[in-house]
Amino acid sequence: MGRWNPDAEGRLRAAALELFVERGYELTTVADIAERAGLTARTFFRYFADKREVLFNGSARLQQLMVETVNSAPKNVTAMGAVTAAVLATSEFFVDNRDFACRRSSVIAAHAELRERELIKLANLSRSLAEALNRRGVLEPDASLAAEAGIAIFRIAFDLWVQNAERRELGEIVHDLLARLKGFSVEA
């Protein structure tokens, strides 16, 4: 009998991404992913609802991190300050996963179904941030405006960060984009 290998979820994620890059998303089946990982399809479904979720299963943890960051921001911090802290917290979330994030991003970019899923996840994240700001006493439309601005910064920073030529850390890119955004609001 073979030796049990730990981290089934990680092995499934790695196998899925390898296969999505090698064969394409549409041509990869759950059975293919499980076989590559040395597991069964049944084991796959213990971790993921479907093959799309392999690419999106970190969304709940990311959302929790960002909402908790907004919730724990000091009371005197502005709505945008709390959202900025949440966006900056994402750099720690992704620090050890740059290679996975780069390959994941290219797979998503190549498939309309996955791009749509990504947009839905970002919209949910924005809504959660706005709700967290509401709980802090920030009224609408300010809460939604700050949340949407934060998600725009996050999305653009992430898109820049996963480019092969980009060498800066995610947090550095976020700071740069925030400075650019502030520059837009200065009247000439």
Question: What feature does the model see in each segment?
Answer:
Residues 64-104:
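Hydrophobic alpha-helical connector segments
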Residues 96, 122-147:
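Hydrophobic alpha-helical bundle segments that form small-molecule/ligand-binding pockets
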Residues 140-160, 173-181:
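Hydrophobic alpha-helical segments that form the core
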Residues 118:
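Small/polar (Gly/Ser/Thr/Ala-rich) solvent-exposed segments
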Residues 131, 166-188:
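C-terminal peripheral helix-coil segments that are non-catalytic and often amphipathic
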